Amino acid sequence: MPTITLPDGSQRSFDHAVSVADVALSIGAGLAKATVAGKVDGKLVDACDLIENDASLQIITPKDAEGLEIIRHSCAHLVGHAVKQLYPTAKMVIGPVIDDGFYYDIAYERPFTPDDLAAIEQRMQQLIEKDYDVIKKVTPRAEVIEVFTARHEDYKLRLVEGMPDEQAMGLYYHEEYVDMCRGPHVPNTRFLKSFKLTKLSGAYWRGDAKNEQLQRVYGTAWADKKQLAAYIQRIEEAEKRDHRKIGKRLGLFHTQEEAPGMVFWHPQGWTLYQVLEQYMRKVQRENGYLEIKTPQVVDRSLWEKSGHWANYADNMFTTQSESRDYAIKPMNCPCHVQVFNQGLKSYRELPLRLAEFGACHRNEPSGALHGIMRVRGFTQDDAHIFCTEDQMQAESAAFIKLTLDVYADFGFKDIELKLSTRPEKRVGSDELWDRAESALASALDSAGLPYDLQPGEGAFYGPKIEFSLKDCLGRVWQCGTLQLDFNLPIRLSAEYVSEDNSRKNPVMLHRAILGSFERFIGILIEHYEGAFPAWLAPTQAVIMNITDKQADFALEVEKTLAESGFRAKSDLRNEKIGFKIREHTLLKVPYLLVIGDREVEMQTVAVRTREGADLGSMPVAQFAEFLAQAVSRRGRQDTE
């Protein structure tokens, strides 16, 4: 006679084993109809699963985060059902849940087309309309092998082979289609109505480019049509803001097949890049950082000492010269330790903050490359702080403040922070971990900042803080990192002379604010839709004459603004002024200065914004002062 305790503390007793669905029905028919699954003693189970002993139970509905994830997972299975009906020779691989949706990897003799994607979606809708029950059967291993052998599902058999300890597995039946999964899944297809297939892409079996290529069908699913419509609207807005399209339209950069994952910066884009670099250089100098430059190609021996060769070799570009193995650096930290090691340091010299705009290269899979957001060649705003254990908290607090100030200058105020603590496998004593975790937590607390605790998610060599910023579409981008490291200074023999004259290893704080210039610029492009604040805009003002008679004065204005440190240019083409205004508005230039005969006579400029606001005529010096104020605000105001 199980007694079921519900979240409100109420209890229900039954004289026999009872399913989650039956408990829901005993509460009410409406709840029973909305039941997706259950959480029994904290563990997610299917609605059909029996509860035989006393237990706590939470009924999971589409309104719960877990319910939405289950809906998405079941939609992936529905993709399998539709694909097997339309393309019987296709072989199904895996179909997991991802952020905002799901995908299914499929092996098929030809590439799927957009027409195929539409056909699969239509068949899924037809299957949903049949309103059939999804049947779960816990099946012995040998029978699972028989089922997938009879269906020629080679990849499912390989997955079973990779789970030698599993003697029974969950099979979920969508009518004639069967898939293997730990579950749980929806009890009926009526929960899957609010979905949409979104795109196709390539993938590799087990994510390894050496393996056979597969096709990936992506989709999204939501609890109701309203949520789906809102998501589709966000996606359409994101597509409008795609940094690749805007980058091409504004002449910022391009990529091409001959240099996959590498960026060709154009004059406008390189100007933007340099503005970021000069800003970060100034900020770091003001906060006690010393800028250095280290080699890009380094002998294998250093990477072996640091541990990167053993753990990261597949992601490193390597070469040989004179019988020696080299790697192009994927990160800067081992080289920064070499700078620290030149000359024995005293505790009086700590903390030592070494910064580098370090060019790094990583051999990312070609399928993962994405514009300038995911590249093989990139530059980090990288720095390493070498300090004593007693200095960890103060250095962490200073970095947190610096990072939030930088994000605010770029217009990002909504920042999420995560503190990741010790994993099971780690180096260093528990006492050292206690101090390190306490230092990071205290630094966050002293700043009055809320944060999510991620137990066990730290690196084996130290805890870390992650900084994620939220853009105008509500998307979250993880950019900044503060990582404490007890291990690398020991591996690379970094030492300092302590106050008692003994030699000790410093604590090393790996830190970055932007992450990489390339990715951060991509985020900025999408956040601002290319309409950068005046301080970032590659061209801050364009001066346009109405006729040739005003050309000389236009050039004078350009020179005056340039001498004041502004990025201004003249457009003296023999085009109608309306045409010029439209063109530079589309190029997102913040300020458009029009000069006609009256402006020449009065020695003024007629000022318009890219948004179409008419600011009137003003002397050049007054506009320069106005522009200087706009630049000084940086991104801390949305409108200027």
Curated annotation (Swiss-Prot):
Cofactor: Zn(2+)
This protein's name: Threonine--tRNA ligase
Biological processes annotated in GO: threonyl-tRNA aminoacylation
EC primary class: ligase
Gene: thrS
UniProtKB keywords: Aminoacyl-tRNA synthetase, ATP-binding, Cytoplasm, Ligase, Metal-binding, Nucleotide-binding, Protein biosynthesis, RNA-binding, tRNA-binding, Zinc
Covalent S-S links between cysteines: none
UniProt keyword Methyltransferase present: no
Known partners and oligomeric status: Homodimer.
SMART domains: tRNA_SAD
CDD domains: TGS_ThrRS, ThrRS_anticodon, ThrRS_core
GO cellular component: cytosol
InterPro entries according to UniProt: aa-tRNA-synt_IIb, aa-tRNA-synth_II, aa-tRNA-synth_II/BPL/LPL, Anticodon-bd, Anticodon-bd_dom_sf, Beta-grasp_dom_sf, TGS, TGS-like
Domain TGS as annotated: residue spans: 1-61
Residues noted as binding Zn(2+) in the record, renumbered to the chain: 333, 384, 510
Record-stated family: Belongs to the class-II aminoacyl-tRNA synthetase family.
Cofactor note text: Binds 1 zinc ion per subunit.
EC number(s) recorded for this UniProt protein: 6.1.1.3
Source organism (scientific name): Pseudomonas syringae pv. tomato (strain ATCC BAA-871 / DC3000)
Ranges where the record places region Catalytic: 242-533
Intracellular or extracellular location(s): Cytoplasm
GO molecular function, one term: ATP binding
